[in-house]
A protein has these predicted regions:
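Polar, glycine-rich mid-to-C-terminal structural blocks
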Residues: 1-10, 173
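Function-dense linear segments that define catalytic or interfacial modules
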Residues: 7-121
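Coil-to-beta-strand transition motifs
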Residues: 12, 203-204
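Short hydrophobic-aromatic micro-motifs
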Residues: 50, 204-207
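Internal maturation/activation junctions in enzymes
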Residues: 74-98, 102, 106, 124-203
Length: 208
């Protein structure tokens, strides 16, 4: 009750499920994930950092109410490239953080204004349609970012610690794909299955 009241009053503390987080860990050969940044959008190894970017979803709301899928994919691809470049441009508070951030080359791509988009489309925040729209946009962004990262790795080489973690990363990506395809079972290495994207509930068929 004390934790709930504190979270309601100040948004802290945050509670994290250690086992679930580490089951989705792409690089466990480097150690377990023990914590996150204060807002919890970055969960990775100790002494690492990444630059963050958020795409404004309302910028892709068309006049007819539909979502600009191609424009959003282009933005996700472009920002993935920008964030990759930023690894070389960033300044870090310690040599260790700088080295590990360079070795793993993590990037943080997200979106903002999902509440505004749902209101503009007349969807309840906690409706099946609202949740499925959010899931579809998130899946599209995640898949585009991973595909763009793979393209860059093909040309420039993978990040330094990829070889050690390749099976884990491919397992996590495969689990993401299963969730995006609506699977309710068959996940690899997960005690708790994720909530899948339900394409039938998504109000914009172009997203699925």
């Amino acid at each position: 009750e004390s934790i709930g009241n504190a979270a309601w009053a100040s948004a802290d503390p945050g509670l994290q499920y250690h086992s679930t987080i580490n089951e989705w860990h792409t690089c466990p050969e480097g150690g377990e994930i023990r914590a996150s940044n204060p807002c919890s959008e970055y969960m990775f190894l100790d002494d690492t950092a990444c630059n963050l970017a958020s795409i404004n979803l309302m910028a892709f709301q068309k006049d007819d109410g539909s979502f600009d899928v191609d424009g959003f994919k282009h933005a996700a691809r472009l920002w993935t490239i920008v964030l990759e470049i930023s690894v070389m441009m960033a300044q870090f508070p310690s040599r260790e953080i700088a080295q590990l951030s360079y070795d793993y080359r993590t990037l943080g791509l997200g979106f903002a204004n999902i509440g505004g988009l749902l209101m503009a489309q007349g969807l309840s925040y906690d409706s099946k349609q609202g949740r499925s729209l959010c899931a579809a946009i998130t899946a599209l962004m995640t898949g585009t970012a991973y595909a763009t990262s793979a393209e860059m790795a093909k040309e420039m080489g993978a990040f330094a610690r990829y070889a050690d973690n390749a099976p884990h990363m491919l397992r996590v990506i495969a689990n993401h794909r299963r969730a995006a395809m609506g699977a309710t079972d068959g996940y690899d290495g997960l005690e708790v299955a994720p909530v899948p994207l339900l394409a039938a509930d998504c109000p914009d068929a172009s997203l699925v």
